[in-house]
Amino acid sequence: MLVYTKSMVTVDAVEKELEKVVDPELGLPITEMHLVDEINIQENGEILIKYHLTAPFCPPIFAEDIVMNIRNLTSKLEGVKKVTVILHGHALANEINQRVNPG
């Protein structure tokens, strides 16, 4: 049973922060572009966010920029201990995921 406490982060809170993350090429929020595929919040405060880009060959710098913005914004939420962001559907997804998710 999942019991929410005052310090537990919610999907709504994460989504609100993700609305601030803008695609560097198009200038639109990634939430408005429906690029976020999954938000998984664990009881221990770890968050897993899965997303995709608009095309499988978007420049990797865009993917890394989006990841850093996602992580910076969501890691500030009360109760968050760790944020892992996974890119999928990109030609270099494995390499990018290894580079942007330390440990």
Place the predicted regions along the sequence by residue.
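Domain-level signature for proteins that mediate thiol-based redox and metal-cofactor handling
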Residues: 1-103
